[in-house]
């Protein structure tokens, strides 16, 4: 067993581990210290899994990569861990695109869709800060990431080789320093100092590193650095003098001049071979296309050291062989680090599926002369490659998948007791015959107490019909399924959270953030129809939606008990027994979680002021019947920004599903909304100044 050694992480919290958190923390810590490569934390909904993870991180004394399956959850985890570890390097690494339309070609329509994107400067800064912290040699680094961590990056040794070290009294020529900044892709701008830019005023050079919020002033005296100062590039306020400073590249893909020359030769050779292939096959259009595009890129690389889409040449830049795995964020970690995969039952399948989708899209681009074959090596990791790069793994889920359980070899740590003392909701089975009347009666019992209900149906048509039936019965209800657009979907979820409706009917309610303490009833119609959304893991997940209420209850409507139902019923009863015994032994009285509307909105990631939400509703409801142009006049600036954000999410889903035309259409709508919002901002600013 390894000793604990000096603590590198400082966990700050007003809470102490409760329930069975202490045992879970110790078991996971011991497993990491003993060198176990795979562990599973099976933590029920509401048991405080994030706090347990934070305590384990505080004990293991090694860098940590925490992977979440979507940006929203990653942002929540990042915020929580920043609070837990204010003195350590908690970093954030997700896709830096506000919107991203990948390059694609549709042969059946002879339609090429150019790559279109908008980079979020703040997220790009946070990504660079993450890689900078990892390469700095610090051990107290926690990186919270989406699956972006498995996508290609520049080689860490190339990136590290480009770092500029500055020290007071160091000999360095001013002009050579300027050339170094340009080689790191900093841009000179003497009028607008911003991240990734520098300005020159005689012997004083000011710059804003991409990974820092403060600017750096470098004062020269002859060929010597006389002074280094940190300052606010907006106000000019001087913060402090520094003895030394490190300047990191302003882009993820960088290479020295020698490597660039080698890469260009490799690209030339590949182009020549590809032209022979096309011409011998009498594909002259494709040959002309690939030659024009590649020659243009080569000219840009020669002149600027960079080109749009340079990542597609990453194999040449890093000197890799065809088919060799790309460098990614995991390469920036030291050999000894810990990976925690949150919601592993969802995250692992997502990681597994990234490679195939990327490959199919790029193969078409290569076949039709839009890209060289080496572009195929700018890709996410294959799942088996990901596995080989993870030295130690903790998978976290309320319903771990077969993969995690098999890899752990039975090393499963359970966290079944909630700090609130709440038991898992009781599950009852009732017959299908008369299920609607029984459901109506049950819903009325729960709504009479001020609680909410979730109802899962088998089909979209059933959800709509049941919604109509409940509404005619005088209940406040809405339905939700895949045909409802993102804007309306968000509106419906807000109505549930703000108490404007009491019942939500849907086919798949697992994808929504519906962990609301007011939900006391979960009803699953036709629970015995084994298959998607009626398997054991889905049933367990949806049953957990009622786990935050002391009167939580789950009803399976079925004529027989399937193997999946039996597993969920037996497992729930086992957990209830453990929870009940703990409460009795420790004198804990179960209590529902109580949250205000504002708290609920905030914790579920839809924190809009209620009045803004009400003002925006008209626009949300009318979007399907009116064009964007008609809406902009009736909406306020902040509402236009909010609508653009919702459409951006819908656009990203379309792009990931390879619905490129839909994504392009939504991109145009986003642009219209943002342009309209900017016009309103400028006009409002003009009115204020007048």
UniProtKB/Swiss-Prot annotation:
Domain Helicase C-terminal: residue ranges: 435-601
Residues spanning the membrane: none
Places the protein is found: Cytoplasm
Beta-hairpin (motif): residue ranges: 96-119
InterPro entries to which the protein is assigned, alphabetical: Helicase/UvrB_N (IPR006935), Helicase_ATP-bd (IPR014001), Helicase_C-like (IPR001650), P-loop_NTPase (IPR027417), UVR_dom (IPR001943), UVR_dom_sf (IPR036876), UvrB (IPR004807), UvrB_inter (IPR041471)
SMART domains: DEXDc, HELICc
MF annotations from Gene Ontology: ATP binding; ATP hydrolysis activity; DNA binding; excinuclease ABC activity; helicase activity
UniProt keyword terms in alphabetical order: ATP-binding, Cytoplasm, DNA damage, DNA excision, DNA repair, Excision nuclease, Helicase, Hydrolase, Nucleotide-binding, SOS response
Domain Helicase ATP-binding: 30-188
Residues that, per the record, bind ATP: 43-50
Residue span, UVR domain: 641-676
Listed Gene3D superfamilies: P-loop containing nucleotide triphosphate hydrolases, UVR domain
CDD domains: DEXHc_UvrB, SF2_C_UvrB
PANTHER family for this protein: UVRABC SYSTEM PROTEIN B
Subunit details: Forms a heterotetramer with UvrA during the search for lesions. Interacts with UvrC in an incision complex.
Entry's free-text remark on domains: The beta-hairpin motif is involved in DNA binding.
Family affiliation: Belongs to the UvrB family.
Function recorded in the entry: The UvrABC repair system catalyzes the recognition and processing of DNA lesions. A damage recognition complex composed of 2 UvrA and 2 UvrB subunits scans DNA for abnormalities. Upon binding of the UvrA(2)B(2) complex to a putative damaged site, the DNA wraps around one UvrB monomer. DNA wrap is dependent on ATP binding by UvrB and probably causes local melting of the DNA helix, facilitating insertion of UvrB beta-hairpin between the DNA strands. Then UvrB probes one DNA strand for the presence of a lesion.
Protein name according to UniProt: UvrABC system protein B
Taxonomic lineage of the native organism: Bacteria, Pseudomonadati, Chlorobiota, Chlorobiia, Chlorobiales
Primary gene name: uvrB
């Amino acid at each position: 067993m390894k000793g604990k050694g000096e603590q590198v992480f400082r966990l700050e919290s007003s809470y102490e581990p409760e329930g069975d958190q202490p045992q879970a923390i110790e078991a996971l810590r011991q497993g990491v210290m003993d060198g176990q490569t795979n562990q599973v934390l099976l933590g029920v909904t509401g048991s405080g899994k994030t706090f347990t993870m934070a305590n384990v991180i505080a004990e293991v004394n090694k860098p940590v990569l925490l992977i979440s399956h979507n940006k929203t959850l990653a942002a929540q985890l990042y915020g929580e861990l920043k609070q837990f570890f204010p003195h350590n390097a908690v970093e954030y690494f997700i896709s830096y695109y506000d919107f991203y339309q990948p390059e694609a070609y549709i042969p059946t329509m002879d339609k090429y869709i150019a790559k279109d994107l908008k980079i979020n400067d703040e997220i790009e800064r946070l990504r660079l800060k993450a890689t900078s912290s990892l390469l700095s040699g610090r051990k107290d680094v926690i990186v919270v990431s989406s699956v972006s961590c498995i996508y290609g990056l520049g080689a860490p040794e190339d990136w590290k080789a480009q770092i500029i070290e500055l020290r007071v009294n160091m000999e360095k020529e001013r002009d050579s320093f300027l050339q170094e900044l340009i080689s790191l892709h900093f841009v000179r701008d003497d009028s607008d100092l911003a991240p990734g830019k520098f300005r020159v005023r005689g012997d004083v050079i000011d710059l804003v590193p991409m990974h820092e919020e403060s600017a750096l002033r470098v004062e020269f005296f002859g060929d010597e650095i006389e002074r280094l100062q940190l300052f606010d590039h907006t106000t000019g306020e001087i913060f402090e003098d520094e003895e030394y400073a490190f300047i990191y590249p302003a882009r993820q893909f960088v290479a020295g001049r020698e490597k660039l020359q080698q890469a260009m030769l490799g690209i030339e050779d590949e182009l020549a071979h590809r032209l022979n292939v096309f011409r011998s096959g009498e594909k002259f259009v494709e040959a002309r296309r690939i030659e024009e595009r590649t020659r243009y890129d080569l000219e840009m690389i020669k002149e600027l050291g960079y080109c749009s889409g340079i990542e597609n040449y990453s194999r040449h830049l890093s000197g890799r062989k065809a088919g060799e795995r790309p460098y990614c964020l995991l390469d920036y970690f030291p050999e000894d680090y810990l990976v925690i995969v949150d919601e592993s039952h969802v995250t692992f399948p997502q990681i597994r599926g990234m490679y195939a989708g990327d490959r199919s899209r790029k193969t078409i681009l290569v076949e039709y002369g839009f890209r060289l074959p080496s572009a195929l090596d700018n890709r996410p990791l294959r799942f088996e490659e990901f596995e080989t790069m993870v030295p130690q793994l903790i998978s976290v889920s309320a319903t771990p998948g077969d993969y995690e359980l098999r890899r752990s070899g039975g090393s499963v740590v359970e966290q079944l007791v909630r700090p609130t003392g709440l038991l898992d909701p009781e599950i009852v089975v009732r017959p299908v015959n008369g299920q609607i009347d029984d459901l109506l009666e049950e819903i009325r019992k729960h709504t009479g107490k001020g609680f909410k209900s979730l109802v899962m149906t088998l089909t979209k048509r059933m959800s709509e019909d049941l919604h109509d039936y409940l509404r005619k019965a005088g209940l406040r209800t809405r339905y939700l399924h895949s045909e409802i657009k993102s804007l309306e979907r968000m509106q419906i979820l807000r109505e549930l959270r703000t108490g404007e409706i009491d019942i939500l009917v849907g086919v798949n309610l697992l994808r929504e953030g519906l962990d609301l303490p007011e939900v006391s009833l979960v009803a699953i119609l036709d629970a015995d129809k084994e298959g998607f959304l009626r398997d054991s893991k889905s049933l367990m997940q949806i049953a957990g939606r009622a786990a935050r209420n002391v009167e939580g209850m789950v009803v399976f409507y079925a004529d027989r008990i399937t193997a999946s139902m039996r597993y969920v019923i037996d497992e729930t009863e086992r957990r209830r027994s453990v929870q009940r015994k703990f409460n009795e032994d420790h004198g804990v009285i179960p209590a529902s979680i109580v949250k205000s509307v504002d708290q609920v909105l905030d914790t579920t990631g839809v924190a809009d002021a209620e009045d803004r939400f009400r003002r925006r509703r008209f626009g949300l409801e009318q979007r399907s019947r009116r064009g964007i142009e008609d809406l902009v006049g009736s909406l306020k600036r902040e509402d236009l920004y909010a609508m653009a954000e919702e459409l951006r999410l819908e656009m990203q889903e379309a792009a990931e599903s390879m619905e490129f035309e839909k994504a392009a259409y939504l991109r145009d709508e986003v642009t219209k909304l943002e342009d309209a919002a900017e016009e309103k901002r400028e006009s409002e600013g003009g009115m204020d100044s007048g």
